[in-house]
């Protein structure tokens, strides 16, 4: 497992970043939809 930690670390960090971006996008979309419906 310690033979090549670089190729194993990069996809994990990329996956985590994309996951956070996805959650942020969903959160912003939900806030916009709730604001639009309440107004």
From Swiss-Prot:
GO process terms (BP): photosynthesis
Species per Swiss-Prot/TrEMBL record: Prochlorococcus marinus (strain MIT 9313)
Annotated TM spans: 18-38
Subunit structure comment from the entry: PSII is composed of 1 copy each of membrane proteins PsbA, PsbB, PsbC, PsbD, PsbE, PsbF, PsbH, PsbI, PsbJ, PsbK, PsbL, PsbM, PsbT, PsbX, PsbY, Psb30/Ycf12, peripheral proteins PsbO, CyanoQ (PsbQ), PsbU, PsbV and a large number of cofactors. It forms dimeric complexes.
Family named by the database record: Belongs to the PsbL family.
One Pfam family of this chain: PsbL
Membrane topology classification: Single-pass membrane protein
Protein name per the record: Photosystem II reaction center protein L
């Amino acid at each position: 497992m310690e033979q090549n930690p670089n190729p194993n670390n990069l996809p994990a960090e990329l996956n985590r970043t994309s996951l956070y971006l996805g959650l942020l996008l969903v959160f912003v979309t939900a806030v916009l939809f709730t604001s639009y419906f309440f107004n």
